[in-house]
Swiss-Prot record:
Record field: temperature dependence: Optimum temperature is 37 degrees Celsius with about 10% decrease in activity at 30 and 45 degrees Celsius.
Function: Involved in the biosynthesis of the anthracyclines carminomycin and daunorubicin (daunomycin) which are aromatic polyketide antibiotics that exhibit high cytotoxicity and are widely applied in the chemotherapy of a variety of cancers. In vivo, catalyzes the transfer of a methyl group from S-adenosyl-L-methionine to the 4-O-position of carminomycin to form daunorubicin. In vitro, it also methylates the anthracyclines rhodomycin D (10-carbomethoxy-13-deoxycarminomycin), 10-carboxy-13-deoxycarminomycin, 13-deoxy-carminomycin and 13-dihydrocarminomycin at the 4-hydroxyl position.
Quaternary structure and interacting proteins, as annotated: Homodimer and homotetramer in equilibrium.
Family affiliation: Belongs to the class I-like SAM-binding methyltransferase superfamily. Cation-independent O-methyltransferase family.
Protein name from the UniProt record: Carminomycin 4-O-methyltransferase DauK
Chain sites annotated for binding substrate: D163, N257, R303
S-S bonds: none
Organism in which the protein naturally occurs: Streptomyces sp. (strain C5)
Transmembrane regions listed in the UniProt entry: none
Pathway: Antibiotic biosynthesis; daunorubicin biosynthesis; Antibiotic biosynthesis; carminomycin biosynthesis
Known catalytic reactions: carminomycin + S-adenosyl-L-methionine = daunorubicin + S-adenosyl-L-homocysteine + H(+)
EC number: 2.1.1.292
Cross-referenced InterPro entries: COMT-like, O_MeTrfase_dom, Plant_O-MeTrfase_dimerisation, SAM-dependent_MTases_sf, WH-like_DNA-bd_sf, WH_DNA-bd_sf
Amino acid sequence: MTAEPTVAARPQQIDALRTLIRLGSLHTPMVVRTAATLRLVDHILAGARTVKALAARTDTRPEALLRLIRHLVAIGLLEEDAPGEFAPTEVGKLLADDHPAAQRAWHDLTQAVARADISFTRLPEAIRSGRPTYESVYGKPFYEDLAGRPDLRASFDSLLACDQDVAFDAPAAAHDWTNVRHVLDVGGGKGGFAAAIARRAPHVSATVLEMAGTVDTARSYLRDAGLSDRVDVVEGDFFEPLPRRADAIILSFVLLNWPDHDAVRILTRCAEALEPGGRILIHERDDLHENSFNEQFTELDLRMLVFLGGALRTREKWDGLAASAGLVVEEVRQLPSPTIPYDLSLLVLAPASTGA
């Protein structure tokens, strides 16, 4: 028989219960995503400050919208600064479409990432099987779905660009490009990393390898940056032999998308394409200690599982993947990330016959 809790213990139990309810809430994340999808903050900033005006702008029912707005006030994203009139708080202003943090797009349920977050509703399935659940929700694997939906592909590329552009100067500055003539950026998106290298090292040329849906975007970006004469873009598949050899091969935010066996296949293709003395540079989220319980690390790690079957990796994992591809982790450089809320690292891999 369980002892009756003491009166003194009950407040602690109530606090614990409130914490659990808050952590287990599904409605609050969906309220935030709905506000982003409806562009509520943009409409408010444009002058639609009442429920009636917002309902007209968003094609929603006023009585239902009021319920949503009440919860947005309760969680601190909106405030009622005059009777019946609402304004965004400092946190709520992050959901403005033109805010540099781009959080509205990240939370918009019509765009690639927030839409993919619905895969978390089948997390038990992913934990039991170790496989992604995106396909069971949407009928196709993540990248195949993007390939058939140009709108999703464009939103995904845009989201990655706004999240990662701020991080490219640091890895470009962290590596010595003196003896590098050509860089191959594998899965390089619109070419932001290759562009950062080209600006820093004028003697270096580069190739960006990407899927068909991103090639035109990358070419346009590099043309606008005035770098198309030094950085070219080719369509290709990094599971096949790479289109050319290089002194440095970049994998920026690529391997976290893939399970270990596929990550080894990608690394093996990269190793095959290295010029003598060349190096593979892996640019990813930094947490190289085993048994990491960091909240941001574990959240992204689970996201990679349910979206793609991929994973974030500790230093021990990187050593194992490198060895399986005939490589060795030669160096790990921690990178400053003043504008994004997590740390990044640059891992330098060398052929096992020459690495440290």
